[in-house]
Amino acid sequence: MTRAELYGSLNQLEGLIDEYYEAQTLDPLRLAPIRDRLIALIHQENLHHTLGIQIPSQEGYPQGRVGSDAILTQFLNTADGYLCELKEAQIRDGLHIFGQCPQHTQLRDLVVAIARNPNANRLGLTRAIALDWGWNFDPLTADLGAELVNCVVPRLPPQPPLERGALIALPFGKSIDLAPSPFQGEGWGGVKTSATPKPIRIIGDAVEILEEYAAELVAKLIETSVDGEGYPQGAPLQVDGEIGINTQTELNWIATKLLPALQQTNLEMVNLLRGLNGEYIPSGASGAPTRGKPEVLPTGRNFYSVDIRAVPTETAWCLGRKAAEVLIDRYTQEHGEYPQTLGLSIWGTSTMRTGGDDIAQALALIGVQPVWDGVSRRVVDFEILPVSILGRPRVDVTLRISGFFRDAFPNLIDLFDNAVKAVAALEETSEQNPLAAQVQQEQMKWLEQGLTLDEAQTRSQYRIFGSKPGAYGAGLQGLIESQNWETEADLAQAYINWSAYAYTNKAEGIAAPEAFNQRLGNMQIVLQNQDNREHDLLDSDDYYQFQGGLTAAIKQVSGTAPEAYFGDNSRTENPKVRKLTEEIDRVYRSRVVNPKWIAGAMRHGYKGASEMAATLDFLFAYDATANCVQDFMYQGVADAYLFDESVRQFIEQNNPWVQRDMAERLLEANQRGLWEDVELGTLERLRLMVNEAEGIIESQGN
């Protein structure tokens, strides 16, 4: 794992924004040329579409209002925070090699990624540094675009603005020079800092200082703690200057706990061979180490997950309830009213990792809280929260569960089904309780169609759907891979056919297409959550199958596209929700076309090229199902993967099948009307690449 950082035009844009603000105060005559370059870059990178703020082109820009232009100022304020979010996004730097611990910069960045996150016993590295420096914001939860207020370096006379690349004072009067990097050891990539000092105006700039300093401390710690023989216990912390007590505590933990655990990555191979030989393999915890669970290290152990009777855990309930309110707030701000209906996909693997964040959120949305046993902390019941306590109406939630969730968590199916029935029986108004109102309405409908009262009541209360017993997935992957579909309606129907099986506390997998279509016809929101940043929504087909498939199905049945949201629960103390289009854009800019990620993939030959192709496939499939990809993204992928000469040569030499497949996929996107704004010359180049790749493959006898 590593920070995405900025690159190319995005890096230039950040520098120009700083110059613009500086010129407003010091040299207004420079504003016009800076503005012209800013506008050109904004349109070049399509940021005006991404941020939803229309900026006229250079030709159409109104003259005479440069210094006070409200639209441009609004854009720059928004863009500043957005660029900071992209810069601090976590992406993978290459692939894990089985049995090998990362080395050099990969090890440094992985340690920082894990140590950054707090848990019950630790502050987290960057938070500890900020606390020792007396900085009055939380780097893990603060708005990166917010103006920096009363944030000065300790033991220095107040000299705002601070500057990146200058001396950063430590709490005891010592200092460390952030640029150039002090690390000269072979294989160390220095921390990237601005060529010229940059004013620190917003919290995102200060967070970058913390991240750079944390990386330098960790790199020095690794150099003094690690040798060819392994990780000696109690390694000295030979860093320049004195370190604050909170930072020292974090560094001690890294030296004595985290680094030794990472060094034991070779246990993956050792224990695999032990298992094949019928020997004992030690057990260990499971989860995401970058989400505050470093106890899952070292890897290579026989991991255990959770006691399903304790799910959702109290910790998961806290996050789930918070995430529910964040979602409702976002929808209410955008639509001016509370949401009434929502579809949520829930997977078994994420439930195991988190202890039940998603099911907790679903319960919170309908206004139900689990009840835990006082000793075992197992879930023994639930209680209905009054609307007066909720402070909002309930939300009618329908779950689309994965096959693994169905197999692993039958107790949660029972819990949610019982909760739905209890909420449906409440005597509340339709405004307070859309779920009960919908159940009553549907019950009458089914009675009119000849069902008995019991049958009508049962069918109207179906709120958990999945694939039929023994089946897994959502039915779309085969269609996408084989190109065996004509329109979005084909994909929608495949999803419906695969998903229309109802699960209750009394029945497993009842074919219920009419009830499922009823749910789809009323659904306003499609929500997909992600619990960690060790991967993203373009790393797996599951995301487009579940969220994209549900989105397409709702559009097919109701005739209206739902609001598609993506929940980011990677920071448990600060869950966020974005529109799906925003998340796609974020992943596209931070990873997909990021030279840093591409370079990491290129270290892995054949497999690295396959990762690039898979990313394009999932981007295409998301667009086919949810219409969430902009034309410039297809062009950007073509430019980064196929039209960049060094990357093209890498792919051609290591995996010519990928060159053919990616070019064909881009051509398919154009043929299906997903990529419309494209030059004929670009399409011709892609066709030529297909032919060239076919020739290489044939010449190799494959």
What are these regions (language model features)?
Residues 1-156, 163, 167-177, 191-702:
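Ligand/cofactor-recognition surfaces for anionic moieties
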Residues 159, 179-184:
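Ser/Thr/Pro/Gly-rich low-complexity, intrinsically disordered segments
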